[in-house]
Amino acid sequence: MLDALQNAFFQTGDTLTSWLSAFSSFLWGWPLLIMLLGTHLYLTAILRFPQRYLLKALKLYFVKDHTDKGDISPFSSLMVALAANIGAGNIIGVGVAIAAGGPGAVFWCWLTGVLGMATRYSEGLLAIKYRVENKDGNMSGGPMFVLERGLNSKWLGTAFAVFTAMAAFGIGNLTQGNAAAEQLHHAFSIPSWGTAAVLTALTALVMLGGIQGIARVCAFFVPFMAVIYILGCLYILTVQAEYIFPAIRYILDCAFTGEAAAGGAAGAAVMAAMRTGVARGLFSNEAGLGSAAIASAAAQNRNPVRQALISSSGPFWDTVIICALTGIVLTTSIIAHPDISCTDGPRLTTLAFSKIPYIGSPLLTLSLVTFVVSTILG
């Protein structure tokens, strides 16, 4: 009886896995790629390439006006959004993308980040324009308010809120927490239940402070850990400097001529690189997902354009810098060690960071866990 139940359980699990895999392949096929990249390109064109205002956006980080309505500073709102964006996907996820779609996926991920800046600009602008002030004086906003107040479609706004909450549990919590648990178990043999308990306690402690408490934690951890992680990547690239330009050329070749990590025909390999790269870009910077605009709505900023510029810089840090650095680091490691298979994303990432003497593995673990915690909070 027990064996029959066990076999039925595994068969159900295999069926569910196959169904989810087929659905994922359909979802990330040509229609969604065209719609997502098409939206990025369309907004880039009609807004006359807002990416060119990146330096102005960076300067606005330090402009603060406490007379503006809002709950947190514009810089803190960006840090909360980046906290939700910069997570396991920027570290382990890039390795998984390379394993699935080859090094060419790094280019498509990077391109999605650059073009996605226009979409995040639009999301930030609409978040400020259609936000509302609650009875307690706090600001609420996001795509659900844009859909309800801008398009006069309450049911669509409600549907967006429900599906966003569901996605938050999946890509925002379960995936991130699992990545941290696996890394801590691999590095320090910490049981998964212990990691889950600590993450739950930390999250509850910070969330008791409301949006201000979350913003304070994110405003400290996100820049601090991003700088440490970037310095670690730069060290690895310095050690493997002779492979940097070959790695970039390899990424570009794989993006257009097609050379998937697992092999296959050229056309299928290009499609795999595009699909995994664009998916990783969306998973990383959320440009087009809409959830990052919820944090933008809480900013002390009455000028929608100013907040839109600040919001648009998010994909730059998240995808153009961190994801691209990770991708180049991993590709240099592939070229430097051709005997090592690149079909195992997590192992490839661990190998790359082993180039940092003494602190390579702890640095990778610390970066991953910190980014995971900030993602769950964001």
Residues covered by each model-derived region:
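Flexible loop linkers connecting adjacent transmembrane helices
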Residues: 49-74, 96-106, 110, 118-151, ...
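Selective recognition of specific alpha-helical transmembrane segments in multi-pass small-molecule
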Residues: 115-123, 197-211, 222-242, 275, ...
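Membrane-interface loop-to-helix entry segments
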Residues: 35-42, 46-59, 179-184, 191-252
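N-terminal alpha-helical transmembrane segments of multi-pass membrane transport
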Residues: 1-88, 98-105, 116
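Helix-loop-helix module between adjacent transmembrane segments
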Residues: 39, 43-44, 112-137, 143-207, ...
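Alpha-helical membrane segments and immediately flanking helix-loop junctions
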Residues: 68-100, 126-144, 148-150, 162-165, ...
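Extracellular/periplasmic helix-exit of transmembrane alpha-helices
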Residues: 123-130, 232-250, 262-264, 298-301, ...
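Select transmembrane alpha-helical segments in multipass membrane proteins
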Residues: 33-38, 73-81, 153-167, 197-198, ...
